[in-house]
């Protein structure tokens, strides 16, 4: 397995402390990788800064061609990437290969096209004898911090728009799931000029802090927890860096009495438990109107009970393990606290799986109240709660009564209600009669403590640029 860092176009071994990388399906150590040293972090940033002088002045066509080549090489090595993602994350292999790899390739191809469509405003005379124009220019060096739930996908979301806009990037994947990012580094080094892409390995304290705090870094992009976002914002405040934050969610799923119950059950069974629930948009916080509450709980419980956990290389496996032992304990603790309330009922699941690996049974909890921790706090596991509600006004208030603001969905046959409720929800994305659908052309991002900035779409590309005014006297 490729375990070297990419610094200034060269694959080099880390010079810091070695860290184990695990297979969460077995609990075994896959390999140990040496972290980047402080000197290597500095070298990577300085290489990116030096490369920016030329890369930032390339034409959109040149940048697009590089991104298209990278998309092609990922597609050609799709099986290799899927196997690495499966072994390092515990994802079902068929899901990694059939769902994630095509989406990752599409992200790079989309931004290759978007790079050639990014424009400033046309020139105009707003002062006599002077012509003004608006430019959208790259920022410089971007430090990108990717999470452990979708390592390669999130690397793509961060690399593609930053590079398309003309920035240079230093990427740090999670130390828990670094293997696909390191493999990507190996393939990218022969496509992009030296220093344009740099990939490091290490923990937040030893590598993330010196990277994000480096004076040559002009922007920090993070997908991670609220706590990590707070830390980076505080850590970088003195240097006034631009920050781009996607900090998780607790998606409300509002099910009205007139909803298609079978569609809701199928949707939540899939989108509440995909990737073992380790998804910031997971359909995990259901509000069911009282007229259909009992029916929904019964049917959804039966459906969730049929979800199959198993070995990632088994074609019939629907749920793999959680990413780490520490995360398994966090999820287990959250469910035990919910059970201890006395009013929350475990419909199915509610326990760790026996045997090796970090498996937790797909869980449905009924009778949760608005103020319960299981409703208010992100669990980030295969755990869905159901809360009954009376009317539209109440459920909109409850849905918005959250520190999160990333994703939401509304299930109803009433078109007017769908529009009315969607307009009032304080979430970056609202789906109607579906959930979890993402496309490269549409923006993904949140509000409130879920963060700010957009991934994907032309809005995502603009986030990696600075607006400049140029005035010419004539």
Swiss-Prot record:
GO terms of molecular function: aminobutyraldehyde dehydrogenase (NAD+) activity; NAD binding
Coiled coil: none
One GO term of the biological process aspect: L-lysine catabolic process
EC number(s) recorded for this UniProt protein: 1.2.1.19, 1.2.1.-
Pathway this chain belongs to: Amine and polyamine degradation; putrescine degradation; 4-aminobutanoate from 4-aminobutanal: step 1/1; Amino-acid degradation
Reaction(s) this enzyme catalyzes, per UniProt: 4-aminobutanal + NAD(+) + H2O = 4-aminobutanoate + NADH + 2 H(+); 5-aminopentanal + NAD(+) + H2O = 5-aminopentanoate + NADH + 2 H(+)
Positions that bind NAD(+): 146-148, 172-175, 209, 225-228, 280
PROSITE patterns xref list: ALDEHYDE_DEHYDR_GLU
Keyword terms, alphabetized: NAD, Oxidoreductase
Pfam families in the record: Aldedh
Domain of life assignment: Bacteria
Keyword Cell membrane: no
Active site per database record: 246, 280
Enzyme class, first EC level, given as a word: oxidoreductase
Keyword Isomerase: no
Function: Catalyzes the oxidation 4-aminobutanal (gamma-aminobutyraldehyde) to 4-aminobutanoate (gamma-aminobutyrate or GABA). This is the second step in one of two pathways for putrescine degradation, where putrescine is converted into 4-aminobutanoate via 4-aminobutanal. Also functions as a 5-aminopentanal dehydrogenase in a a L-lysine degradation pathway to succinate that proceeds via cadaverine, glutarate and L-2-hydroxyglutarate.
Note: 4-aminobutanal can spontaneously cyclize to 1-pyrroline, and 5-aminopentanal to 1-piperideine.
Family to which this protein belongs: Belongs to the aldehyde dehydrogenase family. Gamma-aminobutyraldehyde dehydrogenase subfamily.
Assembly mode: Homotetramer.
Protein's name in the database: Gamma-aminobutyraldehyde dehydrogenase
Gene: patD
């Amino acid at each position: 397995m490729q375990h070297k860092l990419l610094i200034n176009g060269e694959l080099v071994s880390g010079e810091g402390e070695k860290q184990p990388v695990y297979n969460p399906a077995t609990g075994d150590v896959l390999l140990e990788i040496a972290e980047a040293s402080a000197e290597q972090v500095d070298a990577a940033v300085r290489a990116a800064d030096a490369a920016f002088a030329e890369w930032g002045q390339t034409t959109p066509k040149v940048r697009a061609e590089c991104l298209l080549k990278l998309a092609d090489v990922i597609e050609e090595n799709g099986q290799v990437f899927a196997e690495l993602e499966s072994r390092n994350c515990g994802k079902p292999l068929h899901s990694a290969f059939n769902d994630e790899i095509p989406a990752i390739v599409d992200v790079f191809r989309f931004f290759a096209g978007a790079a050639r469509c990014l424009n400033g405003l046309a020139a105009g005379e707003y002062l006599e004898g002077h012509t003004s124009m608006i430019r959208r220019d790259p920022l410089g060096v971007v430090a990108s911090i990717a999470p452990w739930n979708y390592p390669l996908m999130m690397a793509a979301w961060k690399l593609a728009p930053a590079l398309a806009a003309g920035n240079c990037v230093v990427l740090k994947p999670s130390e828990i799931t670094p293997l696909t990012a390191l493999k990507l580094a190996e393939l990218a080094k022969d496509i992009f000029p030296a220093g344009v892409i740099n990939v490091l390995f290490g923990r937040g304290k030893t590598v993330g802090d010196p990277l994000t705090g480096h004076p040559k870094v002009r922007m920090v992009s993070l997908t991670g927890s609220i706590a990590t976002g707070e830390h980076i914002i505080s850590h970088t405040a003195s240097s006034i860096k631009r920050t781009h934050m996607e900090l998780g969610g607790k998606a409300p799923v509002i099910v009205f009495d007139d909803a298609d119950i079978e569609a809701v059950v199928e949707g939540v069974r899939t989108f509440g438990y995909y990737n073992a629930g380790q998804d910031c948009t997971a359909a995990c916080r259901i509000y069911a109107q009282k007229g259909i509450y009992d029916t929904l709980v019964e049917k959804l419980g039966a459906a969730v009970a049929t979800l199959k956990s198993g070995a990632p290389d088994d074609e019939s496996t629907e749920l793999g393990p959680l990413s780490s032992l520490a995360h398994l304990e966090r999820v287990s603790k959250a469910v035990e606290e919910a059970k201890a309330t006395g009013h929350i009922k475990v419909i199915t699941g509610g326990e760790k799986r026996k045997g090796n690996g970090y498996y937790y049974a797909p869980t449905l909890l009924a009778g949760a109240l608005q103020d319960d921790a299981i409703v208010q706090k992100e669990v980030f596991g295969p755990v869905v709660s159901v809360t009954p509600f009376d009317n539209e006004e109440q459920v909109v208030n409850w849905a918005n009564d959250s520190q999160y603001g990333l994703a939401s969905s509304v299930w109803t046959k009433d078109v007017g209600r769908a529009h009315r409720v969607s307009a009032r929800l304080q979430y970056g994305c609202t789906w109607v009669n579906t959930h979890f659908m993402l496309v490269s052309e549409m923006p993904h991002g949140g509000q409130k403590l879920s963060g700010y900035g957009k991934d994907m779409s032309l809005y995502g590309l603009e986030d990696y640029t600075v607006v400049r005014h140029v005035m010419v006297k004539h």
